[in-house]
């Protein structure tokens, strides 16, 4: 049913129509391929094999396909412009592009819903078990690769602001409270770019597989992501609190 190599080829053909010299487009291309790799890691450790594994790979390949059109239109990752998950579903299923990636339509509903739900703050209750597993896999893989992205990309590429503007901010009190309470941060509750940065670290509070925590620990992502930025004064104090809280949460989950 699945020809992952053909699907990858179709994906690359689709992406070539966009401006690959645009940092944001390039970021999302690499991110997609890395999410496939992270999915391989999770499937290996969670003993997910056969059709279930191939389906997870395909969903990983397609999960952010709406991002390319979003960046082309707005040159931004901000979902207040347009919801990239809904846009992905539209491109694949309303415009029929899904058949470029898989001939058989029996998995369409799972693929469509996994893409639609991958970036929601909270997924719907009572999902059918095979769908739930795919949704949890893509949500974890996506979040895990975000730690890699935050480890290498510039402030300018990530947030479209200067380093000086970024470092002049403080973490909002409600955001620090969410960290203290081990809570995933709602987009609407973020007030500035350092809040956004902290919200990415808070992804650790919404992972579903033990292997996801092992992956973060193996790569030392919490510490490395905090260490690479040059926080000073009060902002540094805020960030040390965030780092310590997230780090100890990961350690606990690895036990």
What are these model-derived regions, one by one?
Residues 1-86, 128:
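Acidic/His-rich, divalent-metal-binding segments that scaffold phosphate/diphosphate chemistry
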Residues 47-58, 98-116, 130-137:
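Acidic/histidine metal-binding catalytic segments
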Residues 68-110, 121-123:
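Hydrophobic/aromatic-rich structural module bridging two neighboring secondary-structure elements via a short loop
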Residues 77-81, 113, 153, 159-160:
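Alpha-helix boundary/interfacial micro-motifs
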